[in-house]
C-alpha cells in the first residue's frame, strides 16, 4: 500500500473502494453531481485543499470532466492536482452494460494504471523523491509544436493525447497542466518541436 499526502477526490463509492485497496490517503466522494448542491462537502474539500492539498481523480467521460471542471472553479487551483485515467473501452464487472461512452471508469482501472495516474499528477508519495521543477511549458510552446492555433491542431492534440494515454476530452489548458506535470519545457521541446 502506498501512502499519499494529498486527499484524493473521486466520484462515487465504488471508485473509493477500488482506490482504498492500493493507497493510504484520505479518499472522499463527490457523490457524482451531488457535489453541486452540497455546500458542506465543498467546504470540507476546500479545507482539505488548504491543509494537505487534493488530487481530483474522476472518470474520463463527459460527466467526470463536468465534475472536475466544477471543482477547478470552486477550489483554489494552486492547491489542486488533477490525475487523469486513460480512455479504455470496456465495462465494470458489477455492471450489466457499459457506460454511455463505453469507457472504463476509475473503479474499472488496474491498480498500476491508477498509481501511474497519481504519479503523473504529482502526488506526494511517502518515500519517493519529488523531481525538481524545471522551466514550465507555456501555451506558446504548444503553438510552436502545432498543438494550438493551426488548421490541424486538434488532430495533433488528439494524437498526442492517445500517445500519452490521456482522455480525449482533455482541454488545451488541461493538456498544458498535464504536460507540465509529466515533463520540463526542455524535454517537451526535444520531443515535439
Identify the role of each PLM range.
Residues 116-119, 123-193:
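C-terminal, charge/polar-rich interaction regions
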Residues 85-132, 136-139:
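Activity-critical C-terminal alpha-helical subdomain
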Residues 6-7, 13-17, 21-51:
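Acidic, glycine-rich catalytic loops of TOPRIM or P-loop NTPase phosphate-binding modules used
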Residues 44, 62-65, 69-76, 112, ...:
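Phosphate- and other anionic-substrate recognition elements at nucleic-acid/protein interfaces
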Residues 77-87:
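Short, acidic/small-residue loops that bind anionic groups at enzyme active sites
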Residues 22-23, 76-78:
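Short, structured coil segments at secondary-structure junctions
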Residues 34-37, 57-67:
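Acidic, metal-coordinating catalytic cores used for nucleic-acid/nucleotide bond scission
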Residues 10-11, 58:
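Short beta-strand scaffold positions
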Amino acid at each position: 500500500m502506498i501512502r499519499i499526502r494529498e486527499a484524493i477526490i473521486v466520484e462515487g463509492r465504488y471508485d473509493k473502494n477500488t482506490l482504498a485497496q492500493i493507497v493510504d490517503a484520505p479518499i472522499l466522494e463527490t457523490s457524482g453531481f451531488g457535489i453541486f448542491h452540497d455546500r458542506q462537502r465543498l467546504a470540507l474539500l476546500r479545507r482539505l485543499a488548504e491543509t494537505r492539498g487534493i488530487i481530483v481523480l474522476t472518470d474520463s467521460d463527459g460527466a467526470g470532466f463536468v465534475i472536475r471542471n466544477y471543482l477547478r472553479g470552486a477550489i483554489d487551483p494552486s492547491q489542486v492536482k488533477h490525475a487523469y485515467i486513460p480512455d479504455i473501452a470496456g465495462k465494470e464487472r458489477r455492471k450489466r452494460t457499459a457506460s454511455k461512452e463505453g469507457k472504463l471508469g476509475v473503479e474499472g482501472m488496474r491498480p498500476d494504471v491508477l498509481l501511474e495516474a497519481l504519479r503523473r499528477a504529482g502526488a506526494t508519495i511517502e518515500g519517493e523523491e519529488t523531481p525538481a521543477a524545471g522551466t514550465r511549458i507555456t501555451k506558446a510552446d504548444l503553438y510552436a509544436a502545432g498543438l494550438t492555433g493551426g488548421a490541424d491542431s486538434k488532430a495533433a492534440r488528439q494524437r498526442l493525447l492517445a500517445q500519452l494515454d490521456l482522455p480525449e476530452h482533455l482541454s488545451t489548458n488541461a493538456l498544458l497542466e498535464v504536460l507540465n506535470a509529466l515533463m520540463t519545457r526542455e524535454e517537451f521541446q526535444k520531443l515535439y518541436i
